[in-house]
């Protein structure tokens, strides 16, 4: 494990934005503070470094986001959309919505960045506007194993169930 200094972390960035099926994140962005994060977050990005892979046509995909291509990560990103994951259940009431203050209370003394998502306080899918955040947690050590990475994110989700359960594997 490689020690991390302060609240620094590394994101891996694509040269596209909002492309749902993008899997290539070849550009490294060292985050030392809010300004660096704001610059990197303008583009599709991930918290883990991934190796190159081949697509079905045999073409190389640089820094391919995939579990088998996981190399390392020094931060964990979690989402909180304040929505009910079970479509059969009623929507969450506003008094159940979580904010950065709730995350800070759940993780006392743990540094994190809270970034409003692009749908923060916007109506979406027929649901009323609500707070939606991406949370970035700089790690004290670099994780270099996909199973350990997924276990860390799963543990964070178990500790704070309001985090989105769809983004806890090593390919997220």
Sequence positions of predicted segments:
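Amphipathic alpha-helical coiled-coil/leucine-zipper-like oligomerization segments
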Residues: 152-156
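Flexible helix-coil linker/hinge segments at domain or subdomain boundaries
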Residues: 157-172
């Amino acid at each position: 494990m490689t020690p991390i200094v302060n609240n620094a972390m590394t994101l891996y960035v694509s040269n596209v934005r909002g492309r749902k099926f993008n899997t290539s994140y070849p550009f490294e962005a060292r985050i030392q503070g809010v300004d660096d994060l704001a610059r990197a977050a303008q583009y599709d990005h991930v918290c883990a470094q991934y190796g190159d892979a081949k697509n079905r046509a045999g073409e190389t995909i640089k820094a391919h986001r995939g579990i088998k291509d996981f190399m390392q990560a020094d931060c964990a990103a979690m989402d909180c959309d304040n929505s009910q994951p079970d479509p059969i259940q009623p929507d969450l009431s506003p008094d159940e919505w979580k904010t950065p203050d709730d995350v800070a209370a759940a993780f006392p003394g743990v540094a994190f960045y809270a970034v409003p998502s692009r749908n923060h306080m916007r109506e979406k899918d027929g649901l009323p506007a609500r707070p939606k955040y991406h949370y970035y947690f700089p790690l004290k050590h670099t994780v270099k194993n996909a199973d350990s990475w997924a276990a860390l994110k799963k543990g964070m989700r178990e500790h704070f169930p309001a985090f989105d359960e769809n983004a806890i594997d090593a390919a997220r």
